[in-house]
Amino acid sequence: MFDFASYHRAATLADAINLLADNPQAKLLAGGTDVLIQLHHHNDRYRHIVDIHNLAELRGITLAEDGSLRIGSATTFTQLIEDPITQRHLPALCAAATSIAGPQIRNVATYGGNICNGATSADSATPTLIYDAKLEIHSPRGVRFVPINGFHTGPGKVSLEHDEILVAFHFPPQPKEHAGSAHFKYAMRDAMDISTIGCAAHCRLDNGNFSELRLAFGVAAPTPIRCQHAEQTAQNAPLNLQTLEAISESVLQDVAPRSSWRASKEFRLHLIQTMTKKVISEAVAAAGGKLQ
């Protein structure tokens, strides 16, 4: 049995917010794939629980008439993978979700939980960055919307107050023509492993040039990051291997990996350059282009 000091199952989103406000020590339980591990190890910071996994307000994937998308924060990774809307409009997010753990974990682990735990290795963070998502956050003070870029503030830290709940992700309309995206993850095992390096790219093409590139990396810095120098190098550059090489050099100005038992800093830098070329090449191919 888990050593709960208090356990509350919220009936509504408003109920959950009030429960958090009334108990500053409380932690949210959605999928439970992270929280239950902490409970198993008797982490005292997780003895007060507010259960939100059944809240309808946190579920669902919807497509608006203007092409924008809303994904509830308690949407599971299996639901992300299987939904035709995400398959069509956010393929890199689906690819990232497929790379997470195994089917049993994906059936319960939530998109919002993966982002809010603040890990730089969170596989869903890089596609969320390249698709320019905004986060809908509720609290006793009302509702605020914040960009995903900057939401991660440090290792294991996000811009979320104790009494705030991430309710949904909002994605702007994605371009339909001459645009493509891709995700790639390197890990020591092919499945059931944490990323050594993860990345995602989104590009738009115009008459043989990059009109836009968005490139994001995880485990390449203390937080998931967008690679501004690499993106600027691609701006209006010709669609050729020389440009790809220049991007893979400039990305080194954006990253700051460290050595760990998983990989040395030097190996991670090598991976970053190699994966930059791979993920951009795949995004270009998805956009109908070809690097000459």
From Swiss-Prot:
Its cofactor is FAD. Disulfide bonds: none annotated. Keywords: FAD, Flavoprotein, NAD, Oxidoreductase, Purine metabolism, Purine salvage. Pfam families: CO_deh_flav_C, FAD_binding_5. Pathway: Purine metabolism; hypoxanthine degradation; urate from hypoxanthine: step 1/2; Purine metabolism; hypoxanthine degradation; urate from hypoxanthine: step 2/2. GO terms for biological process: hypoxanthine catabolic process; purine ribonucleoside salvage. The keyword DNA damage does not apply. Its EC number is 1.17.1.4. It catalyses: xanthine + NAD(+) + H2O = urate + NADH + H(+); hypoxanthine + NAD(+) + H2O = xanthine + NADH + H(+). The keyword Thylakoid does not apply. One of its GO terms (cellular component) is xanthine dehydrogenase complex. InterPro entries: CO_DH_flav_C (IPR005107), CO_DH_flav_C_dom_sf (IPR036683), Diverse_Substr_Oxidored (IPR051312), FAD-bd_PCMH (IPR016166), FAD-bd_PCMH-like_sf (IPR036318), FAD-bd_PCMH_sub1 (IPR016167), FAD-bd_PCMH_sub2 (IPR016169), Mopterin_DH_FAD-bd (IPR002346). Heterotrimer of XdhA, XdhB and XdhC. Presumed to be a dehydrogenase, but possibly an oxidase. Participates in limited purine salvage (requires aspartate) but does not support aerobic growth on purines as the sole carbon source (purine catabolism). This is Putative xanthine dehydrogenase FAD-binding subunit XdhB.
